[in-house]
Amino acid sequence: MKGAIFDMDGLMFDTESVFVKAWDYVGDRLGIGPAGFMVIETLGMNLEVTKQKWRERFGGKCDEAEVERMTYEYIDDYYANNHVPVKKGLKNILDYLKGYRYRIAVASSSPENVVKAHLKDADIDKYFDVIMCGDMVAKSKPEPDIYIEAATKLKLPTSECYAFEDSESGLKAALASGCRTIMVPDLWQPDDVMRQKVAAVCKDLDEAAVYIDSDK
């Protein structure tokens, strides 16, 4: 194995809990009630697919543009006053991978400006050779496009890359791409079928680093 491709939200950073708070706030403001539960339904999906899920759930009860504006207003205000919450073991696994000369990429469904801002805020941007974001590919997770493109830019076949994911849609994308897929659960817990499909389920990124070391 020569490459490692990381999801971002819920995997490297505890950003999904911030989105739960944001959508509870937005739902209350728009009169539809707390909508943080929608985070589970849209885990790993890009902005356009997320909008589609909101349309399917709420129909004409809320204005799509207003939901987007208020969401990012809340998120921007949060990160203006707080650092991005880093997941346990992130720096450790990145140091481990760099020490063994792995090529490392991000494959996140979030927009490019958000991904780059979070990586810089956490002071880990220097670890990544490639950054792939949701607005760089035509098809969102669970389609495998973003993982295939990340591996291509790393100049590696997907079979030579680990993929690290926390969401169902992300896991489906990584598995379909041919990456050796490791799950680190966050808000969504895998069923027995998914557990059998992935290479490993690890409680955190420290445990994932131990798994990689044993998988040589």
Where are these regions (language model features)?
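Asp-based, Mg2+/Mn2+-dependent phosphohydrolase catalytic module
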Residues: 1-2, 95-98, 111-216
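Conserved SAM-binding loop
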Residues: 12, 86, 104-107, 139, ...
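Metal-dependent phosphoesterase signature
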Residues: 29, 33, 54-92, 100
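Short beta->alpha linker loops
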Residues: 42-46, 70, 85-89, 110, ...
